[in-house]
Amino acid sequence: MSLTRLLIRDFRNIETADLALSPGFNFLVGANGSGKTSMLEAIYTLGHGRAFRSLQIGRVIRHEQEAFVLHGRLQGEERETAIGLTKDKQGDSKVRIDGTDGHKVAELAHLMPMQLITPEGFTLLNGGPKYRRAFLDWGCFHNESGFFTAWSNLKRLLKQRNAALRQVTRYEQLRPWDKELILLAEQISTWRAEYSAGIAADMADTCKQFLPEFSLTFSFQRGWEKETEYAEVLERNFERDRQLTYTAHGPHKADLRIRADGAPVEDTLSRGQLKLLMCALRLAQGEFLTRESGRRCLYLIDDFASELDDERRGLLASRLKATQSQVFVSAISAEHVIDMSDENSKMFTVEKGKITD
C-alpha cells in the first residue's frame, strides 16, 4: 500500500497542498522552519489521528483556523482506498474511508502501517519502558487482529482498578476487576512475547549490519515475575497497591531491554550509534511485517543527515531501497539525498509552508 495523493489544509504552517506522490522515495528539501517536518507530520497524523510533535491540537491547526483537513489516496495491489481525517480545536475527529463517515482512527492505522525516524526518536532507546512497549504493541497491532480491542479493554480495567484501590479495604472487593484483568494481561503478554521472539532474528541481523562492533541482545520483560501467575502477584501486592493507589505490576509495566556488550545501550552507544540502532530496529520491524503479512511499511524520516556520516547514510538508504517501500525523507539540502534519487523518485521544495515539485 502506498500513498499516491495527499491533500493538506490548515495543518501547521501549510495553508493548502495537493501533492501527487511517488510510490518510492519522496524527498522534502527546505530550510529549518520551512514546513518539511509539517508535511511528514501531516502524513503521520493521517495514519494515527494525532501529531508526533505535539499532543495539543491548537498547535497543529494553522493559526486562526478552526480545523485541519487531511485526505489521501492509498494504492494497493488490487484496489484504491480514499481516506480522510478532519480534526477541530475541540479535539473532535471525523474519519472518512471510501466516502463514508463514522470510522475509527485505528482503521487508518491498520491501512497505513508506518515507521517514524526523527532526531527525537532516541527515546525508543534511552526513554522509559513505555516507548519500547509501544514498539512491541505496534507489531502486535499489525500482527494480531484482536490486539487493539484487548489492549483498549486492559487500559479501561486498569483505570477502574486504580480508582477502586482508593476505596476498597479488602482484596475480595477487587476480584470483579481482576478476573477479567488477569485474562487480558496474560493474552497481551503472550502476544508481546511471541512477537519479540519472532522479530528477534531480524533485529539481530539488521543491528549487526549497522553496528558490527557491538554484540546486541534483546530481552522481553512482561511486567511481573517470570515464574509467577499474575493472579498471585495481584493478590500478594494488594496492600502495597492500595497504598500506592495504582497497580504496580502487570503488562502496563512491560519492557524490551536492549543491551550492547552486556550493558544498557544508552550507557554504551554514542548519539550517532543510537540513531543507527534506532534505524535498524525500525527497519527490522518493517521488514518483519512484510515477510509475515506481505504488507509494506511507509517510512517517514525527518532530518536524514542528522548524526550520520556519509557511509551510514548510504547504508540506511540502500536498506530502505531494498524494502521496496514508500519513503518520505526530509533534508536541509538536496546534496544530502541526491545519491538516493532515481527515475521513480520525487523531489519537493518546501518554503514557508509552500510545497512545490
Swiss-Prot record:
- Keyword ATP-binding, does the record have it? yes
Q: Where in the cell is it found?
A: Cytoplasm
What's in the GO CC field? cytoplasm
One Pfam entry for this protein is: SMC_N
- Annotated GO biological process: DNA replication; DNA synthesis involved in DNA repair; double-strand break repair; SOS response
- Single GO MF descriptor: ATP binding
Principal location:
cytoplasm
**Which residues hold ATP?**
30-37
Q: Which UniProt keywords apply?
A: ATP-binding, Cytoplasm, DNA damage, DNA repair, DNA replication, DNA-binding, Nucleotide-binding, SOS response
InterPro entries from the entry? DNA-binding_RecF, DNA-binding_RecF_CS, P-loop_NTPase, RecF/RecN/SMC_N, RecF_2
Q: Which Gene3D superfamilies match?
A: P-loop containing nucleotide triphosphate hydrolases (3.40.50.300), RecF/RecN/SMC, N-terminal domain (1.20.1050.90)
Similarity annotation: Belongs to the RecF family.
Function of the molecule? The RecF protein is involved in DNA metabolism; it is required for DNA replication and normal SOS inducibility. RecF binds preferentially to single-stranded, linear DNA. It also seems to bind ATP.
NCBIfam families, per the entry? recf
Q: What's the protein called, per UniProt?
A: DNA replication and repair protein RecF
Give the species this sequence originates from: Shigella dysenteriae serotype 1 (strain Sd197)
